[in-house]
């Protein structure tokens, strides 16, 4: 039975860069999708974030973090561990076409997590406005060495106290 109530969640949207490139065959795409699922699951576990709701899109994942998890406490370790998993994956795949690079977008707002998917305005903002923004695409394409680029919404920045921007280190994680 659907739930109508929305609560405030940190919503993280992750999308694989150029997942449908012509040189990526179906077996390679499937391997990449499986690896991404493992990377995100491991990152959530290492960050001690339990009971998150996830939607697997094939070449990406949408995550609604539990509402009781403070935004900054959740995001910093999650992004760090996703970056660690990406670096490990990419170092162990000699073929460039099997390497994974991600666009990550984050919003804080209303969401309704179901057992296997998430809905709500926070997801729409993270996906439609941020994840597909040219700013985020340019940030990732402008540095071929970094495994991901991260963009947070104005609301997330305001509520979490990240106003003024966040400095990312050489490895694409907060320092």
List the model feature ranges, each with a label.
Residues 68-171:
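Catalytic beta-strand-to-alpha-helix segment of the class III nucleotidyl cyclase homology domain
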Residues 1-73:
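Catalytic NTP-binding/metal-coordinating core of nucleotidyl cyclase/transferase enzymes
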């Amino acid at each position: 039975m659907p739930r109508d109530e929305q609560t405030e969640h940190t919503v993280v949207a992750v999308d694989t860069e150029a997942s449908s490139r012509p040189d990526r065959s179906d077996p390679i795409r499937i391997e990449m999708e499986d690896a991404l699922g493992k990377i995100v699951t491991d990152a959530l576990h290492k960050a001690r974030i339990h009971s998150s709701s996830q939607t697997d899109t094939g070449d990406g994942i949408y995550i609604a973090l539990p509402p009781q998890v403070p935004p900054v406490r959740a995001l910093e370790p999650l992004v760090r561990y996703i970056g660690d998993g990406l670096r490990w994956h990419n170092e162990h795949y000699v073929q460039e076409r099997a390497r994974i690079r991600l666009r990550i977008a984050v919003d804080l707002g209303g969401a309704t997590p179901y057992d296997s998917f998430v809905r709500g305005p926070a997801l729409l903002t993270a996906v439609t406005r941020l994840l597909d923004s040219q700013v985020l695409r340019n940030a990732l394409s402008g540095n071929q060495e970094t495994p991901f680029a991260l963009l947070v919404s104005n609301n997330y920045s305001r509520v979490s106290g990240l106003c003024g921007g966040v400095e990312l280190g050489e490895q694409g994680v907060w320092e």
